[in-house]
């Protein structure tokens, strides 16, 4: 269906079509929605787990090479993650935009958003790679350990070769997920774990008489896995199965209008800025950890790595909820969107509680995946109860913020997240950990307190949201025609 085709037949104006859709909304089959959401969540979790596992695989292998290797990779990843996560988070605007376009049955518009996303991340990958090559200045500032700095610089420069393919993969993955196409992404993500593990082992330790590359083999393995993902997904979904044709009108430079770019950036901009500011704060948190010793740096890397894996497991419901909320809002179905939001909340709480119990019962076993150092394990166990508490609170907070993101309401999440991490988490970590001598535990006490505040604010904002108004805005935005970029699309800027 072309972008200029009417999406809701029988009415001429965007406003009247939206009002008609809202008035005629069908009842929601809760059982069917639950199973559909769960199936989507399972596949999103598997693909997200696979993506996060690529980083954790590096940590697991490097942790067995020694504390210096793990600390170097951790510090390098902490600083390189600032710009990369910013661009990647900006690309998640595709979930909202493609999801709403798909829900409005405007496939061509979903393809346009993908094109814009690919161009934006390609342009932004250049300064990100430059940042990777200049990381030595920040590492010198972070630690006095010359060996850690040297290893960290090598790690970051090799890893720079993975920037562009990882961003392209993110765009294509989110594009297909917003349409409900999950299985290929899950399969590719799962296979990439095997590729990363095999590449890490062979490149670090060698095989068939070859001695391997040692430390340098780990980032090189990540580069190989990063290229494997987009090549495999594009080859299967686009070149072979041609799944994109249902939401793709072909490359069209005329689609890159200033108004569309503004709509994209009005969603991507706050999310990207929030991610960069938050990750910069996390990097500053690593400086606090550095003041407590290299063992604390390594322990924090282990705890953060475990949190990432647990996040991947519960995020399935968060991402699936965001996608389905965007779909239903784009289709003009606020009642269904609200039901999906509630289902996502209940399922997330249930999943997080199970994961928290499992994490507590397994105790040191999970941490031994990263290191066998007894001193390191004791540090990790010291903060395990605080870590589990923070994880549970943050999981619910992220779910609610994802619902707001599905509506396109990203400004409030960006401001709250940015201010809370700088004005609450960091001061608590520094004064508690360094000034008051509470040590490593203070870092995670800061996380808990910050997440309680964020959860409270996001819950308040969501409780006051007019779902019908959000659906009408989404329908209006996704009904914009290519002949009227300064009309309806211009009006949508205040909502994006």
Model region roles, listed by residue range:
Residues 12-21, 33-95, 266-289:
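Signature of the first transmembrane helix
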Residues 39-58, 158, 192, 225-229, ...:
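Transmembrane helical elements of multi-pass membrane transporters/channels
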Residues 59, 70-129, 133, 169-185, ...:
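Small-residue-rich hydrophobic transmembrane alpha-helices
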Residues 52-71, 139-146, 204-213, 272, ...:
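Helix-terminus/linker motif at the lipid-water interface of multi-pass membrane proteins
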């Amino acid at each position: 269906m072309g972008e200029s085709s009417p999406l809701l037949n029988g009415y001429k104006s965007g406003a009247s079509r939206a009002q008609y859709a809202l008035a005629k909304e069908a009842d929601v089959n809760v059982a069917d929605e639950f199973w559909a959401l769960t199936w989507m969540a399972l596949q999103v979790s598997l693909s997200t787990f696979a993506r996060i596992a690529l980083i954790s695989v590096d940590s697991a292998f490097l942790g067995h090479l020694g504390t210096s290797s793990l600390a170097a990779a951790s510090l390098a990843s902490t600083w390189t993650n600032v710009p990369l996560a910013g661009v990647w988070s900006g690309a998640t605007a595709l979930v909202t935009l493609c999801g709403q376009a798909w829900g409005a049955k405007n496939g061509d518009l979903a393809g346009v958003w993908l094109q814009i996303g690919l161009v934006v991340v390609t342009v932004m990958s250049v300064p990100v790679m430059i940042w990777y090559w200049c990381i030595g200045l920040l590492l010198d500032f972070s630690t006095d350990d010359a060996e850690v700095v040297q290893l960290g610089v090598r790690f970051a420069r090799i890893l720079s070769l993975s920037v562009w393919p990882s961003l392209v993969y993110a765009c294509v993955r989110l594009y297909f997920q917003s349409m409900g196409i999950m299985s290929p992404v899950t399969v590719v993500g799962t296979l990439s774990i095997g590729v990363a593990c095999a590449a890490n082992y062979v490149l670090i330790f060698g095989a068939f008489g070859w001695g391997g590359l040692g430390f340098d083999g780990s980032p090189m393995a990540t580069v190989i896995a990063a290229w494997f993902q987009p090549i495999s997904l594009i080859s299967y979904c686009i070149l072979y199965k041609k799944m994109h044709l249902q939401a793709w009108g072909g490359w069209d430079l005329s689609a890159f209008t200033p108004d569309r770019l503004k709509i994209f950036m009005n969603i991507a901009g706050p999310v990207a800025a929030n991610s960069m500011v938050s990750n910069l704060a996390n990097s500053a948190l690593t400086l606090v950890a550095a003041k407590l010793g290299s063992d604390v740096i390594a322990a924090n890397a282990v705890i953060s790595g475990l949190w990432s894996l647990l996040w991947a497991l519960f995020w399935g419901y968060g991402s699936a909820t965001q996608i389905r909320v965007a779909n239903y809002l784009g289709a003009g179905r606020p009642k269904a969107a609200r039901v999906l939001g509630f289902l996502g909340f209940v399922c997330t709480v249930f999943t997080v509680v199970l994961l928290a119990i499992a994490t507590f019962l397994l105790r040191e076993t999970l941490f031994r995946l990263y290191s066998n150092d007894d001193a390191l394990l004791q540090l990790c166990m010291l903060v395990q109860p605080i870590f589990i508490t923070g994880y549970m609170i943050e999981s619910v907070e992220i779910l609610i913020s994802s619902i707001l993101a599905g509506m396109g309401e990203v400004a409030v999440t960006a401001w709250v997240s940015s201010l809370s991490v700088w004005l609450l988490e960091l001061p608590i970590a520094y004064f508690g950990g360094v000034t008051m001598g509470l040590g490593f535990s203070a870092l995670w006490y800061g996380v808990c307190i910050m997440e309680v505040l964020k959860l409270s604010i996001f819950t308040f904002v969501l409780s006051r949201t007019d779902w019908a108004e959000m659906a009408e805005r989404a329908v209006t935005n996704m009904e914009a025609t290519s002949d009227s970029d300064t009309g309806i699309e211009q009006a949508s800027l205040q909502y994006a």
